[in-house]
From Swiss-Prot:
Location(s) in or outside the cell: Plastid, Cyanelle
Gene responsible for this protein: ycf36
Domain of life of the organism encoding this protein: Eukaryota
InterPro entries in alphabetical order: CGLD27-like
CC per GO annotation: cyanelle
Coiled-coil segments: none
Principal localisation: plastid
Stated name of the protein: Uncharacterized protein ycf36
Species the sequence originates in: Cyanophora paradoxa
């Protein structure tokens, strides 16, 4: 990252970005659209099936068979919203650390927080990555979250 950087390597913003981008649970919003939609569908399907099975085994199928599917849609959307929020919070934390001119860190874990001012070279590099790599992921997550919340709201209205 730089010749003199007092931050431990795992707390450096660029390394945090690379770790997050290589993580299986966090990298799929930065993938191609086809892979992104596949994972969205997978998460939604898991939530739908769990909710569907729970409502099915509560004997609601006999009384209100259509409500099982509506509850499944609500459950799938709810699980998807929780996952998208988790992803958004993780990526926005990394974006904030990349775009910031100062970085707070702890050397020993004894709550002795320090602040390091980035050099201009490191700041330019981090901001370029934040603007051109992380912000598009955040925008994609925001748009997806908005659409899923609209679908959930519409489903709740028709129920």
């Amino acid at each position: 990252m730089c010749t003199f950087c007092p931050i431990p390597t795992e707390q450096q913003p660029l390394n945090e970005y690379q770790i997050l981008n290589n993580s299986v649970l966090f990298n799929w919003p930065s993938q191609k659209l086809k892979i992104y939609f596949f994972y969205l569908f997978t998460i939604y399907s898991i939530g739908f099936l769990l909710t569907f099975l729970i409502t099915f085994y509560n004997d609601l199928f006999i009384v209100h068979p259509v409500n099982i599917f509506v509850h499944g849609i609500i459950g799938g959307n709810f699980v998807l919203i929780l996952d998208l929020l988790r992803l958004y919070l993780g990526w926005s934390y990394i974006c904030q650390r990349l775009l910031s001119a100062t970085v707070s860190y702890e050397e020993s874990g004894w709550y002795d927080g320090q602040i390091w001012v980035k050099s201009s070279e490191v700041l330019i590099q981090d901001r370029l990555i934040g603007i051109y790599q992380v912000r598009p992921v955040l925008n994609r997550l925001k748009q997806t979250l908005g659409v899923v919340i609209l679908i959930l709201g519409f489903t709740l209205l028709i129920q």
